[in-house]
């Protein structure tokens, strides 16, 4: 590729809404342009990166015998009604009517369509197992698109689906995908980890997320310093949770000794440390289809884990907390003075509050608190559940390490779905005895566009992107200095360009009449890993100058040796 024939589209300006480095660099390097909230045009440089990401994924899919298909992005709504996910997905589904008033959606995922289609193609257990995949655009009507392409409304995914006659066959394919994802992300030089995760609206009992570390990531992952435990924040537990539910806490009532029990008092001042306080939240519940209220209690220095709270049977999903006006109307007090004493609603307390003594709570009287409160003496024992987020330095579930927390970007997710979709959409196959059996299913996703952002988050410096060779828009750039004024430089530049092209090296030649500083700045911004500089000074000694983007190392290499030198570099 010649730069004079290429849409470079680099920019010095950073848009006001580009808050994180990957978003800024993708715009400045000419990878993407925003058309509307959460919608982007991918320019040639960005498309070259996406193409290489797709090639790596396709190669790995072929290794595990996954067959490529392509499903429509528009899906009939009735399939989502059959799977009972239409309302579960909520307003993220973009729904519309065609001219005949038929109901459709723009697909955010394809479990319903693929189950329906595969069910009509597979009739016998002898055709199983079978795995299909596609690389396609998806759409989710995000309420708040942000962070560039990390959280968009339209995005590109690789989604794969496997079908099986039994659970053990599903587990075998699931493990193959797990290993395949490890290979894929390693080839892209990503610093990542795989963690246990919840299946959410997808369903199933087992799933793993693949998370790329990033200080700008939306997710939090939890892992122990002994490397024996990892989880996403939603599901993370500490040894406190494990120990608590091993015991029958209902028979282990707190017995305060007389010398430790202090008299409960009312105070206008809140001078106790957060670790000795209990916060109270009111939340909507549904018991026997009747909407009501429950109270949630956590320690003052802890944070509610919304995911864990939603797992409680009586809690409405999504969570609906009472606001200030509603609390005042119901209890007659501002939220900050809300407490559990005297509340005539179900009370659910985090297990970390179980052993608390002489703690502080809101008094349900404005500007007052109760101090020196104790369970079973001043307050009846509530229902205890694990409803908090773990914190740094909590003991890990096995008790042998301490928990650490890092921010991350989810780049892949795999699920064992079991028979969830085949039962609801009524897809079955004939087994050996002639009976019909519902298919077992797995589903495996990779966020292709999101990977590009994750790599940039991990591989950049003050000058721009530092792409790994495997997904760089170009592997090599040739930078002839003052080529228009020196014909020898021009001849050597085009000679090397043709030589690299013939060898299959992905190369671009900057043949513009630009100042050296502009050329160097642009290739550093774009992040081309291997740079060859041709100047009058170097060619006088039959040399060219090689510079590696990631370490700025400059080496003089003889012109006749440069091709083999680059080939060896690309093999590493």
Swiss-Prot record:
Its EC number is 6.1.1.15. Keywords: Aminoacyl-tRNA synthetase, ATP-binding, Cytoplasm, Ligase, Nucleotide-binding, Protein biosynthesis. It comes from Buchnera aphidicola subsp. Acyrthosiphon pisum (strain APS) (Acyrthosiphon pisum symbiotic bacterium). InterPro entries: aa-tRNA-synt_IIb, aa-tRNA-synth_II, aa-tRNA-synth_II/BPL/LPL, Anticodon-bd, Anticodon-bd_dom_sf, Pro-tRNA-ligase_IIa, Pro-tRNA-synth_IIa_bac-type, Pro-tRNA-Synthase_IIa_type1. Consists of three domains: the N-terminal catalytic domain, the editing domain and the C-terminal anticodon-binding domain. Homodimer. Catalyzes the attachment of proline to tRNA(Pro) in a two-step reaction: proline is first activated by ATP to form Pro-AMP and then transferred to the acceptor end of tRNA(Pro). As ProRS can inadvertently accommodate and process non-cognate amino acids such as alanine and cysteine, to avoid such errors it has two additional distinct editing activities against alanine. One activity is designated as 'pretransfer' editing and involves the tRNA(Pro)-independent hydrolysis of activated Ala-AMP. Its main location: cytoplasm. GO terms for biological process: prolyl-tRNA aminoacylation. The keyword Protein biosynthesis applies. It is found in: Cytoplasm. Transmembrane segments: none annotated. The lineage of its organism: Bacteria, Pseudomonadati, Pseudomonadota, Gammaproteobacteria, Enterobacterales. One of its GO terms (molecular function) is aminoacyl-tRNA deacylase activity. Belongs to the class-II aminoacyl-tRNA synthetase family. ProS type 1 subfamily. This is Proline--tRNA ligase. PANTHER family: MITOCHONDRIAL RIBOSOME PROTEIN L39/PROLYL-TRNA LIGASE FAMILY MEMBER, PROLINE--TRNA LIGASE. It catalyses: tRNA(Pro) + L-proline + ATP = L-prolyl-tRNA(Pro) + AMP + diphosphate.
